[in-house]
Amino acid sequence: MAAGNYALAQAKLKEARNLFNQVSNFYQDLSAVFAGIDTPIANNSRDKAVEAAQKRDDSTFQLALVHRALNQPEMSVPLLVQVLKSQQATRSLGKKAYAQLVELGFSDIPYKR
């Protein structure tokens, strides 16, 4: 993205976002299968689902920034809301997503906590 190749960045980030989402869902499913049967497997799978979801959210946030750079706020806003919903407003990435929504004028009141 630093080199300005936004089309390539969009494609790579969309692909990463989709792949990490699939991986997270697979680990969630695996965790559910072993819930109540084998706690270590269930917990390990849940932890891996969370790790993949974090990477998905990182990719989603970066994709939103690419859309901002291309002056496409209508594409950025839904992505930022998805990140905020997943991360919550109290986590670092959630705060960054909300700050972007304020900068875009989608939200009026900055979150200062």
Task: Give residue ranges: language-model regions.
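Boundary/linker segments of alpha-helical solenoid repeat arrays
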Residues: 21-32, 87-97, 106-112
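Residue-level signature for tetratricopeptide repeat
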Residues: 2-3, 66, 104
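Solenoid-like repeat scaffolds
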Residues: 49-51, 85-88
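Alpha-helical adaptor scaffolds
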Residues: 6-73
